[in-house]
Amino acid sequence: MNEIFSATVIIGVLSSGIRLATPYLYAAIGETFGQRSGVLNLGVEGQMLLGAFASFYVALTTGSLVYGLLIAMLVGALMGLAMAYVTVNLHAEQGISGIGFYLFGLGMSELLFKMLLGTVETVKGFSVVPIPFLSQIPVLGEIFFQQNILVYIAFLLVPVAWFVLNKTTLGLKIRSVGENPEA
């Protein structure tokens, strides 16, 4: 029982937690822009599932993690555009449409997995990039500063997104449209 609470296990769990939460951070940043523009997208999880499957499949078949990442971004963007079109242009209820997009992403990703793969495969992920000096800090260095590049980019995007939304003309326009769609 004591080995469960050892420093190595706790550090490993916390480090993995940060790495595994990164896709949700990306989704939250993207959804923040959507929310501020007045679109409630409850289908974000479906976007993530379809993007994750597309990314995995492309990375598996091409051997390129970069191609997989690019296709995930493309699939997520297309799903977001489709959601925006349905709610803004077709005047569909955002909550119901979002749930529909979530269920579509859930079902389609599972269907494509079974049709195209059928069995569990693995793809080696992006390599860990330790940040010099900071990664040597006991405990905190191992948790925060020995991650892959996508984790670092996600955390850098948080203040960038805040700046864009709150300190730029583009952010003002996004917030204005979200507050008053008739403007």
What is each PLM-predicted segment?
Residues 32-39, 64, 92, 115-122, ...:
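Transmembrane helix-loop junctions in multipass membrane proteins, especially transporters and channels
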Residues 160-183:
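Membrane-helix/interface signature in polytopic inner-membrane proteins
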